[in-house]
């Protein structure tokens, strides 16, 4: 994101960034990939599912929950986006409003 926005920031400035990321389960690891596959197969077969990796069903669902929630309501992943943007832009005042969502895709963030 910052690679695309930095030239704009340098040319005319940016005061606020609203951004959403849609991240595949592979970002959580092998167990998450297996959980998505298992839940998908079971739901399509009319069976009950088990949630072990994620706190809620991931198959046919989206979870606005990547990493742990912080006291300010953002997740750690969202806070990393804020911190990194401010650091790279050299602007501690820039407002960044990220939403990071886990989606039921095996590989490839959107």
Task: Pin down the residues of each PLM region.
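Active-site-lining helix/loop region of Rossmann-like oxidoreductase modules
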Residues: 1-110
């Amino acid at each position: 994101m910052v690679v695309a926005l930095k030239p704009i920031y340098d040319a005319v400035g940016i005061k606020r960034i609203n951004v959403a990321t849609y991240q595949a389960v592979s970002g959580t690891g092998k167990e998450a990939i297996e959980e998505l596959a298992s839940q998908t197969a079971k739901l399509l077969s009319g069976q009950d599912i088990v949630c072990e990796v994620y706190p809620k069903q991931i198959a046919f669902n989206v979870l606005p929950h990547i990493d742990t929630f912080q006291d300010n309501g953002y997740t750690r992943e969202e806070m990393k986006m804020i911190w990194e943007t401010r650091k790279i832009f050299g602007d501690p005042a820039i407002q960044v409003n990220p939403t990071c969502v886990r989606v039921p895709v095996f590989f490839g963030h959107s």
